[in-house]
């Protein structure tokens, strides 16, 4: 296998696997009974267009194909930021008093997407140019004024989301703090990785791997995660060995912990 096929198809294959994984997570979240399922469904779907766009960019053999990939990528990032904002509002409900951002912020995202889509006519947002990377021709971004606006909008809204998630993490009870803090750290890592890609002007956006991982983490912690180990440590010295049966339920009615007496009572010990 020559260098062209090895580097391009390896990353394209990784991106395709991430897309399929995110699609599975999204569909499973939509079928789940939790209210968060809908928010997770849309967020995981939103991660797919940027990854798809970068897969197209990586394998592009001509400028037109690379341009198509870039448009999918940039408009997809607006979709990601919007759904990340909506997910944060749903996920952090109860630990925050206000919305993540005022309602008019979503119109900024619409305006940004529109100004990107008219770039073929105006040429104000970005262009691409070829470069040689590992002895192969790739296409890299040449940012213009519209691209600067795009980055200001997306990074600005992401900062609001990150601050809101940070506040929710601080306010969360010790039992559930882990489910907030891990996603918060993952968001920080992904944003730093994306920033490095922009600064380095690399022809391959490896931060898309982080986007895929973040989507899986969101699915797991929003839908399936239960703080069993911490609950067991906190409650073992209080009611684990008591004679009375003790059940611990979430606000949505899901049993997450029982002591020995309760286990014997329901036949699960």
Q: What is each stretch, according to the model?
A:
Residues 262-269:
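PAS/PAS-like sensory domain cap-loop motif
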Residues 3-21, 33-122, 148-155, 205-211:
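Individual alpha-helical transmembrane segments in multi-pass integral membrane proteins
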